[in-house]
Regions:
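N-terminal core-binding DNA-recognition domain of tyrosine site-specific recombinases/integrases
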Residues: 1-60, 75-77, 189-195, 212-214, ...
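Conserved tyrosine-mediated DNA breakage-rejoining catalytic core shared by Y-recombinases
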Residues: 68-69, 85, 118-175
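Short, polar N-cap/turn motifs at the start of nucleic acid-interacting alpha helices
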Residues: 122-131, 247, 266-286
Length: 312
């Protein structure tokens, strides 16, 4: 998908030898507003294509020479949810479509594509140590779900022991479904991209963040904004309570799982395996945030490091 959107579309109709450095720079312009990770990925793919062509003597000139590896917007810092926020989130969506997805993300740390591709043959509940095997991944093509055994990385293939709260939740879900997918639509099929967005909307509509809506005034469409107060009800749907007064995203649930493991003292190498991180740097960056983000706990260490020597 990345290759199609950012390389094939702008450059796909050209011959390799006709591509200039200006063409490459023009192709990279839309990526300036995207994440630094996506920019780096496209940058790497382009360089792989043209350096390979150069080595095969298909090109006399490599248009990627001098292409900066830095670009895109730096990623926003992701904060793990607190225990209180986790409880509030689960209480708010209990019995609603996103509940199972949220439970799996919070208590097994699976990525979104791993949860949406999860089938019951990879959920082992009736064993002494219940666990989930990650063997498939979901992706969307033209808003159609595609389930593949090709995972994000080799490290993504893993077996994750799950706690009792998630085991009980999955047992209950399994008893009520005939689908082979753990998270499925009403027909038992894996969710499409738009279906998942609708499922997640059950979370966002219960947020106390300002909501925009439109209404007609004197024949004109006017944009209005309402800022709900926690505990208030939606005017047109009294059953809907605005309760979530914090930001929450699907990836944040996985980040919370990893953070909680580190807070519990699980060694980073084990966390790396459970999270499916191929690069230990990803795990260690989170570890550093967890270990070194409380100045009061570091005060004694800093004081000891800079204490005057006995002979001074």
């Amino acid at each position: 998908q990345t290759m199609n959107n950012y390389i094939v579309k702008p450059l796909g109709d050209m011959y390799l030898e006709d591509v200039t450095a200006d063409d490459i720079r023009l192709a990279m312009i839309p990526l300036a507003s995207k994440s630094a990770g996506l920019y780096s990925k496209v940058n790497m793919l382009l360089k792989c294509v043209f350096y390979s062509a150069e080595r095969s003597q298909l090109l006399e000139y490599n248009p990627c020479e001098g292409l900066s590896a830095k670009g895109g917007k730096p990623g926003k810092k992701i904060n793990a949810l607190t225990d209180e926020q986790v409880k509030l989130l689960l209480d708010t969506v209990r019995g609603l479509p996103p509940y199972t997805f949220i439970m799996i993300a919070l208590y097994s740390g699976l990525r979104r594509e791993e949860i949406l591709g999860l089938q019951w043959d990879c959920v082992c509940l009736d064993v002494p140590t219940p666990y989930i095997s990650v063997r498939r991944a979901w992706r969307s093509e033209n808003n159609r779900p595609v389930i593949s055994t090709t995972l994000k990385t080799k490290a993504a293939r893993r077996d994750i022991p799950i706690p009792k709260c998630l085991t009980d939740c999955l047992r209950e879900v399994k008893e009520k479904t005939e689908s082979e997918y753990v998270v499925a639509d009403r027909n038992g099929n894996p969710l499409s991209s738009s279906q998942f967005q609708r499922v997640w909307k059950y979370v966002t509509v219960r947020s106390t963040k300002p909501h925009n809506y439109y209404k007609y005034v004197n024949g004109q469409c006017v944009k209005c904004t309402v800022t709900p107060t926690p505990g208030s009800h939606q005017k047109n749907n009294p059953k809907l309570v605005y309760a979530i007064d914090f930001d929450v995203t699907p990836h944040q649930l996985r980040h919370t799982y990893i953070t909680n493991l580190l807070y519990a003292g699980v060694d980073p190498k084990t966390v790396q395996y459970l999270a499916g991180h191929e690069n230990s740097k990803t795990t260690m960056d989170i570890y550093a945030q967890v270990k070194y983000n409380k100045p009061e706990q570091l005060l004694s260490v800093v004081n000891a490091a800079f204490a005057p020597s006995a002979g001074a």
